[in-house]
Amino acid sequence: MAMLWLAVLLTCGAPAALLPTSGVGCPSRCDPASCAPAPTNCPAGETALRCGCCPVCAAAEWERCGEGPEDPLCASGLRCVKNGGVARCQCPSNLPVCGSDGKTYPSLCRLQAESKAAQGKGSAAIIPIQRGDCQQGQRDPDSPRYKYNFIADVVEKIAPAVVHIELFRMLPFFKREVPAASGSGFIVSEDGLILTNAHVVTNKHRLKVERSDGSTYDAQIIDVDEKADIALIKIKAKGKLPVLLLGRSEDLRPGEFVVAIGSPFSLQNTVTTGIVSTAQRGGKELGLRNSDMDYIQTDAIINYGNSGGPLVNLDGEVIGINTLKVTAGISFAIPSDKIRKFLAESHNRQSTGQGTKKKKYLGIRMMSLSQGKLKELKEQVKDFPENTSGAYIVEVIPDTPAEEAGLKEGDIIISIGGKSVTSSSDVSDAIKKEGTTLHLVIRRGNEDIPISVTPKEIEF
């Protein structure tokens, strides 16, 4: 690859007028006895006279060369070019190049000449390691990297509005806060409104938001739609904040490129790309209880860290909120048309001053195991259990009753209180019963495990 790169540099560009390297005036036979003594110190290396007989010092870059039999030839890699009546040795590539010695050379040929001289003195060879200046490199707007890297352009555009959200809980014994969970979100108003998933902020611990520039803020929960899994929180920041605008998810087409971005590790944004598998995967088809919403299915990887972050199109518009990963290659996002509806309803709720609500909370995200979904999972997950029904746990939220009881992602709830579970709705109905400890049987691999868990009441 290095040799190919050198060849490209050496062959790019066209000289004004190349002088011949052999021609009229040369003897029919070379007589070495007639040659002057061989040179001993040639900075640009040795070559032969144009007739190819006697050794002489080669002309270096920008030194004069000529047409006559006794005129010096250019060093290897240089061309004798005549401009304005004067012939000089020139490098086919006049672009700067960075050498392995950390110096910037005006051309590849100059670097090669310096390398040859260094080797003649017993030093290490200098090799080209980078086009352009050693400190800045070379930005070529016409190169394929800059012309066709549209994903990087999208990420650069949206990243400033993506935030990291961290939830804290208090340890009563030690009287200090510790991180309990985290997720992502994105800013939708210049005064600090942020959208994320409801499950990211459900436990209502203290929320801390960190932006990509490192600034941190305490956040307040403004509104939550548990059914749609959308939450609106707010920070107080000085000045106007960068925002993302919503696109229209109804215009999405299968096969369209999308970018999922999140900030699972504070300042370190993660980016995944994929295509839209379908823009209308029904919630009931996924086994999501009471769902009247279609989800966007994509093969862009969505995980717990970038959950709540934006799924954007190539125009940088938000067309969904990353929300659910079933397995590698099967992820789901809440469509932007549903987000738009939530924001309108939230405005109305705040205007009418509706109070908070309470609900029982277990801390899992699940889906029913339909025949179609079973087939998909068996294709994606090696050794998937031979189940025909149940509630598949897609995610266990940290610091929740589910995690404390020992439930894990990938478990399948097959019974509650001795009654078979056929869908996620059976689990949801059991959670709603007040003061009830749930006695579950879950299938983990090929083993059935009994687990007892008591849902917690939380306030929205």
Curated annotation (Swiss-Prot):
Its main location: membrane. The gene is htra1. GO terms for cellular component: cytosol; extracellular region; plasma membrane. The lineage of its organism: Eukaryota, Metazoa, Chordata, Craniata, Vertebrata. Residues 183-343 are annotated as: Serine protease. The record marks 148, 150, 257 as: Involved in trimer stabilization. The active site is at residues 199, 229, 307. Pfam families: IGFBP, Kazal_2, PDZ_6, Trypsin_2. Belongs to the peptidase S1C family. SMART domains: IB (SM00121), KAZAL (SM00280), PDZ (SM00228). Residues 1-18 form the signal peptide. It comes from Xenopus tropicalis (Western clawed frog). Residues 74-136 form the Kazal-like domain. PANTHER family: SERINE PROTEASE FAMILY S1C HTRA-RELATED, SERINE PROTEASE HTRA1. This is Serine protease HTRA1. Forms homotrimers. In the presence of substrate, may form higher-order multimers in a PDZ-independent manner. Serine protease with a variety of targets, including extracellular matrix proteins and proteoglycans such as biglycan, syndecan-4 and glypican-4. Through cleavage of proteoglycans, may release soluble FGF-glycosaminoglycan complexes that promote the range and intensity of FGF signals in the extracellular space. Consequently, facilitates inductive processes in the developing embryo, such as posteriorization, mesoderm induction and neuronal differentiation. Regulates the availability of insulin-like growth factors (IGFs) by cleaving IGF-binding proteins. Residues 344-447 form the PDZ domain. Residues 22-92 form the IGFBP N-terminal domain. GO terms for molecular function: growth factor binding; serine-type endopeptidase activity. Its EC number is 3.4.21.-.
